[in-house]
């Protein structure tokens, strides 16, 4: 295979207020848990079923850290894009432990607030940038120059 892709996209709700830590170099890191819920109807009983999956999310990107600090609280609905990483460490008894996390740390990461509890517009951050969605204007489109023929 010539290349590969490690990309995770999630839409869910924050399970508790984000945890903000500071490294020895003064860089802020945010840990949060994001719940995604899948629902379906049982074929036999016609009962509605639900399953919630909890995802560990770690944010290193300075721009996204500042957005989360200001706007994200328990219950916030988020759209996130990041990469999947598994960490390994030894606990106090010397046993190996593993955890898999969705990591947002570079310009390929994205976070969008999907509820507007704290602002009038949805705030989006990507890498070190933060901006509001621009207003979308309706534009008319002239269909007169399109052929009626199918191009294949």
UniProtKB/Swiss-Prot annotation:
Does this UniProt record's set of keywords contain DNA-binding?
Answer: yes
The family database entries (CDD domains) matched by this protein are listed as: SSB_OBF (cd04496)
Q: Which domain of life is it from?
A: Bacteria
What are the boundaries of the region Disordered?
Answer: 117-152
Which molecular-function annotations from GO does this UniProt entry contain? single-stranded DNA binding
Regions of compositional bias (Polar residues) in chain numbering: 117-127
The entry's DNA-binding region: 54-60
Map motif Important for interaction with partner proteins onto the chain: 147-152
| Record's keyword annotation contains Ribonucleoprotein | no
Q: Which UniProt keywords apply?
A: DNA damage, DNA recombination, DNA repair, DNA replication, DNA-binding
Stored Pfam families:
SSB
The processes (GO biological process) annotated in the record are: DNA recombination; DNA repair; DNA replication
Q: What's its job?
A: Plays an important role in DNA replication, recombination and repair. Binds to ssDNA and to an array of partner proteins to recruit them to their sites of action during DNA metabolism.
What is known about its subunit structure? Homotetramer.
Spell out the protein name for this chain. Answer: Single-stranded DNA-binding protein
